[in-house]
Structure formats: C-alpha cells, structure tokens
Amino acid sequence: MTTYGTNQKSSNDLAPKLEYITRGINQHKRSGLATRRPWKQMLDLGSFNFPRKLATVITRIRANTVYFQTNYTIVVLFSVFLSLIWNPFSLLVLLALLGAWLFLYFLRDEPLTVFDREIDHRIVLIIMSVITLSILFLTDAKLNIAVAIVAGALAVLSHAAVRKTEDLFQTDEETSLLNP
C-alpha cells in the first residue's frame, strides 16, 4: 500500500513545540503570580495605622513595595486602563504595546534572534521603551496617562506608608510551612 500524497506527520509531531511554548508561558505566569499577594491580606483594615516617624514611613514603603510589588503594579496599570477608557484608540495602542512587550521581552526564555543574530535583552528593553514612549507620546492621551500614573503611584505610596509590616514575614513563613 502506498502512502503517496498523504501527510506522514501525526498530530503528536507538534506537541513538543507547543509544550515548549506553553512551558515558557506557564513558568513566567507562575513566577509573576507567585509574588502577587492576596488582596484580602493587602487590604486588611487591622494592618493599617499612621506611623509617627519619617524613618518608619520610609521603612514601611521599602518593605511593602517589595512585598506587594505585583499588586502595586496591577493597581497602577488598572489606573492607566481606567484613564484610557474615554480614549479608545489610545487604549488599543496600549494593549498592542502590552502584547509586544509580552511577546518580545517578558515571555521570552531565550534571547531574541533577528537574522540569525542574538539580541541582548537590554537592547530589547531599551528599544521597546523608546518605541513605547514615542508611540504613547504621539497619541492624544499623554495627559491622561501621566495623571493616571501619578494617581496610581500616590495610591501605592499612601498604602505602603500606612500598611504595617510586622505581619508580612510571619504570613510568608506560615505559607511556606503549609506548602513545602
């Protein structure tokens, strides 16, 4: 029996490539989401009080920005998203740029290769930053984006300043004991 004209590849031939792609995405999602803290812990009203000294404020801001880094990033990005709802073209541009950042920088395990040459991740970072700032500068939402970033940063800094840090590491130890 001849097999002329039939496709010899089985559907499983694509499995290793697909597994490689999804493995990279899953590792990055896990590492990024692993640092996201529960919103209930972040907004626990019993963990707020006003500090008496400036040194305490600085210490709290440093500790909380490291501990709640992913949550704070989500807050600022949500602020930018809300500011762009009234400017749909800029919102689409921002979403396209976000996709480009994810594809070219964040979800990449190996260096970017163009014409059989590896591009260093710092070069990609610089080029993507320049392109992002240039494109957002050309949209009509410059003021909206600037105000949203400042508002998000003020919300983050005010939360970080009044959120007590004594229970942060205790909670980390408890969760590490539960999940060895």
From Swiss-Prot:
Keywords noted in UniProt: Endosome, Membrane, Transmembrane, Transmembrane helix, Transport
Domain of life: Eukaryota
Membrane topology designation: Multi-pass membrane protein
Classification via InterPro entries: Prenylated_rab_accept_PRA1 (IPR004895)
Transmembrane regions listed in the UniProt entry: 63-83, 84-104, 123-143, 145-165
Location(s) in or outside the cell: Endosome membrane
Disulfide bonds: none
Primary site of residence: membrane
GO cellular component, as recorded: endoplasmic reticulum; endosome membrane
Any Pfam family hit: PRA1
GO terms of biological process kind: vesicle-mediated transport
Tissue: Expressed in hypocotyls, leaf bases and shoot apex.
Family, per entry: Belongs to the PRA1 family.
Subunit-structure text: Interacts with PRA1F2.
Protein name per UniProt: PRA1 family protein F1
